[in-house]
Amino acid sequence: MGQKVHPHGLRVGVIKEWDAKWYADKKNFADNLVEDHKIRNFVKKNSYAAGVSRIEIERAAKRIKLNIYTAKPGMIIGKGGQGIESLKNKLQKIVSNKNILINIVEVKRPEADAQLIAENIAQQLEKRIAFRRAMKQSIQRAMRSGVKGIKTACSGRLAGAEIARTEHYNEGTIPLQTLRADIDYGFAEADTTYGKIGVKVWVYKGEVLPARKNINEKEEANA
């Protein structure tokens, strides 16, 4: 039975970048990795209502910089920057002897962001909204925002059924095997009275073509 590779992992180094931008030797690698995991989990849990799409972590000697991509930056920053200071102080307890810098980046089109779409569908399922309706509405909003294609999948005891199943809905094209295709992927879980329901979303935003070198400029430089 065919399984799908993670679209982001497949394209790292081709058209996608790492979410963790640091290097460590064997001695410190495991500690840094666990620290990253704790930071991501804490920020996600603490700022779930703000719609956190992804978190980039950059490390220097005694400094950690977090780039938090969110649909509602005001909710994280808070009044007069109080929210961001509170978050920094809480993170400082997780990360020992390191200075934390937090940079908030606004997600301009949350209706076209795969992670935020998945979380939105999951939230609707928890509010007992029909899964088909939640999926179709999200697809319509995404297509209106200008994406080339979108595919959604819900897995679990849908509508309280005795036997778990998976249902897919898609519109447009999703070229999963094309490496230059900019495909965004998101996953979320809905905690319902019947158990967990997994939500997966793939969004195709178009092709990323390599920058063409200007031959004339190159010739002038050599002359």
Swiss-Prot record:
The keyword Cytoplasm does not apply. Residues 39-108 form the KH type-2 domain. Pfam families: KH_2 (PF07650), Ribosomal_S3_C (PF00189). GO terms for molecular function: mRNA binding; rRNA binding; structural constituent of ribosome. The keyword Glycoprotein does not apply. Binds the lower part of the 30S subunit head. Binds mRNA in the 70S ribosome, positioning it for translation. This is Small ribosomal subunit protein uS3. It comes from Clostridium botulinum (strain Hall / ATCC 3502 / NCTC 13319 / Type A). The gene is rpsC.
